[in-house]
Amino acid sequence: MRIRKATEEDITAITELAEKIWWPTYRNIISEEQISFMLKDMYSEESLKKQLVSGVDFILAEKENLAVAFAGFSLIEPEVYKLHKLYVLPSEQGNGTGKNLIEYITDLAREQGGKILELNVNRGNSASEFYKKVGFEIYRTVDISYHHFILNDYIMRKNL
């Protein structure tokens, strides 16, 4: 397993991963309409390039030179980093890939003076249990209006 910072050249791979991961992850949690909208709004190549330019660092996990997982994070306030996204192919889940990505990002955030790593996770997403196992705790429960959808999330935090 190789974990590295992604570049603009990796945007297509991240878009393809999102398409493969979002449907099985969210099909029983949110509507197909919302999945399609979110993929287009947040994971199109254009959107990912804008995120990269705005300061989001993307991380890619590769196995045998194939992208199997990705994450994105950035500084959102002094000493607080936001894990905007972390997705692992279903075939790779349970193999330590997500944990390795969290450790990689934790190290990068610490090196840059981070004290807290924060994330949002849908309250119906079983990933919240994974995040608890790697040291996150529920900080708040929120309902966020996003275009014509409501995001029912936990905000989780981990001290670095």
List where the protein language model places each region.
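Residues forming the Rossmann-fold NAD(P)(H) cofactor-binding site
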Residues: 99
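C-terminal "cap" of GNAT-fold acetyltransferases
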Residues: 115-128, 132-134, 142-160
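Active-site acidic-Proline motif in GNAT/NAT acetyltransferases
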Residues: 89-95, 123
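Short coil/turn segments at alpha/beta junctions that flank glycine-rich nucleotide-binding fingerprints
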Residues: 95, 112-115
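Short glycine-rich hinge loops at helix-strand junctions in the catalytic core
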Residues: 96, 135
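Acetyl-CoA-dependent GNAT
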Residues: 5-11, 15-91, 102-104, 108, ...
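Extreme N-terminal starter segment of soluble prokaryotic enzymes
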Residues: 1-3
